[in-house]
């Protein structure tokens, strides 16, 4: 494995700066490095470990990929590269159908990046100063980087904090907002734990708790009380179940899905058929129709689209059958407590209820409202007119190549985003297959020949 070039200068210049060294940033760097001199690129990341980000920095073997290994290659034109890497190591999954541990994929991406010769600067960007059609990036140590173009690849923000969570709760160590960071404490062996959320993050935290020896009852609370569905055998249909010429309304989209199910198409195949065209279908909807989908259908779509690996799904079935996992509907309105534990106040359609917990962990979705995210760089981009919020107030508004729209309605010639930061304009933008396609499109746009 080659050593990654690490730069340390008070002031330097680069052709393209990539802010963020997680999966999104590294995928961008790998694709760009195939079309231009890697020495003209610079990945800026404060953490020493690159490529893994939040999802792939886990060290828990039970945390599995939610995509089959055969579609997890880092390069858009080589989706089976991960399988080839596994085979070279003797780790199996050569047929590409397995759901491998996420930490292995993080290791794979780091290995591919290590041979790219893309320089790395281990700093944190705190401010971005526009300089014509380029930018000066200011680091937290006072150094600066002059970049011809800048790619924002900071990944996910923390989830929205639980309301009415007072200082007693915050300082107790019993409430964890950043569940992927080091926890201030572990729950008592048999004391109850409440996970706010019942999606894939909550599943991961349950597995982490069990791996650490916790044997108590875990209660997941979410608005709809739905768990992710499980992956099944690979199925396919010859065309998307929603034709591109369908009248762009939520009702018509749903009508075509129901027709396909009535004709014998499995729900998994129907959902998977839409993955290549979901962003195009989403772009055709009006703001009103997008809001209608978010309100009435998104929770159903999300559980069907973002599925559990089969071994994980079997584990969850066992947890529920034994009574060690309980899933309830409701909205956590407040958390209070004292040195003995926490009291969780939940509002549900059938009424209010309370739960006592030794610990409460926030497993809800990352916050996409950058107006309230604790990130000075993001706030400055909006304040200076370099960025505007995207669909329904989330993340950034970007064009088809990831370029940010400014307050003047114009597309930036030098500022781009990739990955979860594009949720303001794209429906699918968080999974590796979609992010690597964005990386390829960006590299082709910036370097057409």
Question: Language-model segments: which ranges?
Answer:
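Short helix-loop boundary/capping segments at the starts of domains
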Residues: 34, 49, 70, 74-77, ...
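N-terminal glycine-rich dinucleotide-binding loop that anchors FAD/FMN and/or NAD(P) in oxidoreductases
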Residues: 57-81, 236-251
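Flavin (primarily FAD) cofactor-binding/catalytic cores of flavoenzymes
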Residues: 5-48, 54, 92-247, 255-449
